């Protein structure tokens, strides 16, 4: 027997087997509410309405035809696009505009840059759609190991393609003329983007897989950019990623004579102390202090 789950206000009808978990079903259709704890019943924030009553989607088992009202997960984000940085001489691999992605655990950003000069042409950002698999990297690793990696990979690639399209429209640039696409993120976000199972990040010694810069073809992941090169920046360790490498290069810390402290406050937070001779790096979870993932009352800095 197959059950029909009607999802409002999307107006979608989903087929489910008796005993199927509602949150898992909604995830498969990209209709899931936010689930900061990854669907473990700890945060109480994947609430949906069934028969006018609030129910946690992660704890509801489909047993028959049902109508579910789902509040859409947040998709928009505001980002800072201006700031101070070091002058970096650019040597593009290929002609055409350049796109740079920062895959954050919470926010994903696409910058479109002019080749040669690095002048910012446009920027687009959105909330990472993997949020329904958990607000933190540990939750997403657990869901990937439970068989939901391909779904997370599909979600992030689709969103990055959409953001690239938005940035190109803003700048009046044809996507097929983009020559280089560069991607940074913490190790988990990079591996999920590339479709690499993050099991290495779930066990000691948490060794990174991406230990050197890689250059490949972007067309398989971004069909709209068939001629672009895809550049992935290396990770430093299991929980210090390519985004930190990007911070070091953009700030010029790798060329500083005096000791300098660099702090990246995100869902995954990093600190770098040093100069061009030596750097010491550490990471910690900053998200719980800012986003309320696993506390009873709390949320991101957003409307609500």
Model-derived regions, located:
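A short acidic Gly-Thr/Ser loop motif
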Residues: 39-42, 61, 101-107, 113-116, ...
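N-terminal phosphate-binding loop and adjacent alpha-helix
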Residues: 129-170, 294-298
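Local cysteine-cluster metal-coordination motifs and their immediate loop/turn environment
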Residues: 32-64
């Amino acid at each position: 027997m197959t059950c029909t789950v009607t999802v409002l206000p999307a107006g979608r009808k989903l087929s489910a087997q008796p005993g199927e978990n509602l949150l898992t079903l909604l995830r498969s259709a990209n209709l899931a509410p936010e689930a900061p704890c990854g669907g473990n019943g700890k945060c109480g924030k994947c609430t949906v309405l069934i028969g006018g009553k609030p129910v946690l989607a992660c704890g509801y088992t489909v047993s028959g035809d049902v109508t579910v009202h789902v509040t859409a997960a947040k998709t928009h984000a505001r980002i800072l696009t201006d700031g101070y940085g070091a002058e970096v001489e650019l040597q593009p691999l290929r002609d055409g505009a350049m796109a740079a992605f920062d895959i954050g655990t919470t926010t994903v950003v696409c910058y479109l840059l002019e080749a040669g000069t690095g002048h910012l042409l446009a920027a687009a950002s959105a909330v990472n759609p993997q949020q329904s698999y958990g607000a933190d990297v540990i939750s997403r690793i657990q869901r990937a190991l439970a068989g939901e990696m391909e779904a997370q990979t599909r979600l992030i690639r689709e969103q990055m393609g959409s953001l690239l399209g938005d940035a190109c429209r803003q700048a009046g640039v044809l996507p097929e003329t983009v020559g280089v696409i560069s991607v940074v993120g913490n190790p988990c976000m990079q591996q999920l983007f590339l479709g690499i199972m993050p099991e290495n990040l779930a066990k000691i010694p948490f060794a990174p897989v991406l230990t050197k810069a890689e250059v490949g073809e972007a067309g398989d992941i971004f069909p709209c950019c068939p001629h672009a090169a895809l550049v992935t920046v290396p990770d430093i360790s299991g929980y210090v990623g390519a985004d930190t490498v990007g911070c070091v290069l953009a700030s010029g810390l790798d060329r500083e004579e005096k000791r300098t402290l660099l702090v990246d406050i995100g869902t995954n937070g990093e600190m770098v102390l040093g100069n061009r001779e030596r750097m010491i790096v550490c990471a910690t979870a900053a998200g719980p202090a800012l986003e309320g993932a696993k506390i009873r009352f709390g949320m991101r800095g957003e409307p609500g």
